Amino acid sequence: MHPLTEYPRPAMRRDSYENLNGPWQYAITASAQRPAGWDGEILVPYAPECRASGVGRTLQPGQWLHYHRYFAPPAGTGGRVLLHFGAVDYACAVQVNGHLVGGHRGGYWPFTLDITAQLNGTGRNSLWVAVQDPTGHGAQARGKQTLQPGGMFYPAQSGIWQTVWLERVPENYIQSLTVTPDYDARTVTVKAHTSAPGGAANLWAVVRAGGVTIAEDWGSDEAGQDGTVTLHIADEYFFPWSPDTPFLYDLTVGTTQGEEEQFDTVHSYFALRKWSCAPDARGVLRFCLNDKPILLNGLLDQGYWPEGLYTPPSDAAVERELSEVKALGYNLLRKHAKIEPQRWYYHCDKLGLVVWQDMVNGGSRYNLWFVTYLTNVLQPLMRRLPDKAPLWELLSRGSESSRAEYRRELADTVQALRCHPCVGCWVPFNEGWGQYDAAGAVQAIRALDDTRLVDEASGWYDQGGGDVYSLHNYFYPLRVRPQTRTVALSEYGGIAWPMPGHEPPRKTYGYGTAKSREELTARYKKLQLGAVLPQLQKGLSALVYTQLTDVEDEVNGLFTYDRTAIKPDANAVRSVNAALAAEFAKVIK
C-alpha cells in the first residue's frame, strides 16, 4: 500500500518525483543507536499512535522511534538527489547508507536534505530516520497534543506524518521560491534562490491564464543569491481571487546558463487579491477583500482524523471535506493549533476558502486555570492583561530558549505558507497559550509578510495591536461595540451532540449539549439568527463557529469525526448562512 501518492508540494512542482510513502520497518527503543532488530512494519506517513499506521503505540518522552527502508534513486543520471520530508514530529536525524546526512527540529515544517554524496550507485540504498518527541515535556509547538487526552486536548502523535519523497534536480537548481503578487500594481514578483554552484545563472518566468501565456520575462541571479523577475498582468487578464471567483494563474520558473542550456524548471501558481480593513458606507470598520467589504463566515478546523490523527486517509477525503464546507455556504476556515500538509492549502486555494492560520501553540505546561478557565469567567477583566515579562512564566514562556523557539517557529510558518493565496490572516497566539510580547510577534510577521491581516491575540490577552478585535464567547450574551480594529467573533458556539451510530466519545465535551438532530439544528439557528445576525450592523465582520468536525471527546462538530454525516440539518445551515450574507450586504450600505 502506498498512501497519499499525489505530489505533496503543489506550489513548487517538478517532473522528477519518487514517493517513499508505504511500509517501512520500525522500532521503538530507549537509545538513539540503530536497533539490533525491528518491531514490525509501519505505514508511512501515519504516526505510530494512530490506527492507520498499523502500530498503535505511543512514543514516550525519552524514547526513540526508528524508521528504515531501502530505496532506489529517481530515474536519470547526474545532478543532485534531494530527500524531502513534509513534516516529522518532533526532532530527527537522518542517515543514508550509514552516513548522517542531516536532521531537523520542529514537528510541523518541511525540510530537504541533499543526499547525493551518500548514494552508493547500486540502486539499493538504506534510509534510516531516528525520531524523538518530548510531547508535554518541552516548549516546542505541539498544538492540542497531549499524553493524557481528554476534553479539548487530544492524543499525541509522533514521527513522520507527511509525505516523504525524492527528486533528481540539476547541479544548479532552484532551492525555494518567493512569489509576491501586487493587486494594485497588477504585477507578480518572483524571487528564486538557487544553488548556482557553477556561476551566475539566468532566471525566466512565464505566467499563464487558462493555458494562455500572458506574461514572461528574464532576470539574473548572482551565484547562490536571490534573483528576481517582476511580471505585469494586462488588464484583459486581470482576474482577482475571491471565494466566489478563486482564479489561479499558472507560473513556471526556470534557470538557464548561457543561451540554451536549461538547468531547472519548477511549476507554481499564484492569485491576485488584496486584504485590508476599511470603513463601509456607514463608517463601520470592515474586513475588505479586493477593496470590497466581505463577511468572513466560517468554522474552526482542527484537522484531526479518527484513523490517522494529523494525517488524512486520502487527498480525495480532504478535497471532499473542503468542498462540503463551501457547499454549506461558508467561506472561511480557521486552522486551529495545527499546520496542514501543503495540499490542504492548495485545495483551499482552488475552492476559494479563506484560511485564518494559527501559529501552533507551544511553551511549557499550561496553567489552564489562569489562561483558560478563569479568563473565560472573568473575560472583561482579563482581556487586556499585559503580556509583559512579569507574566511570561504564567503564560508558559518563562525561558529565553522557549521564546527563541517560538520566534523560529513563527518565521518557519510564514515562510512555509505565504505562497498560498487562501491564507488571509495570521494568528500568532490563541487564548494566551504560550503567549508573550504579542506586539513583537505582529512586527515580526509584518516584516516577513505585509500582505495579510494579523489577529494579534485570538480570544484574550489582547494588546491592542494587529488588525482584529478578536472575541471568543461561549457563555455570555453577545454584544459588539464599534472598535478601532475590525471585530471578529473568532470562536463561539460549540454545541455538542454525540450522534448515534458513530464512534462514541469517552466523555462528551462541548459548550452545551443537544439531545437530537432537531434540537441541535434549532439551537444552531437560534444562536446564528437570534444572537449573531443582529451584531453585524454593529461591526461584527468575521464569524468562526466551533467547529467543523467532532474531535475525539469534543463532539461539537457540524460533521461526525468519521466525516460520514452532517449532524444539523444541512438545508437549515445553508439557509442560515444565506441569511447572514444577506443581512451583511444590507448593513454595509
Whereabouts are the PLM-identified features?
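Substrate-binding/catalytic cleft of secreted carbohydrate-active enzymes
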Residues: 332-577, 583-588
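Secreted/periplasmic carbohydrate-active enzymes, especially glycoside hydrolases
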Residues: 1-347, 351-355, 424-425, 441-447, ...
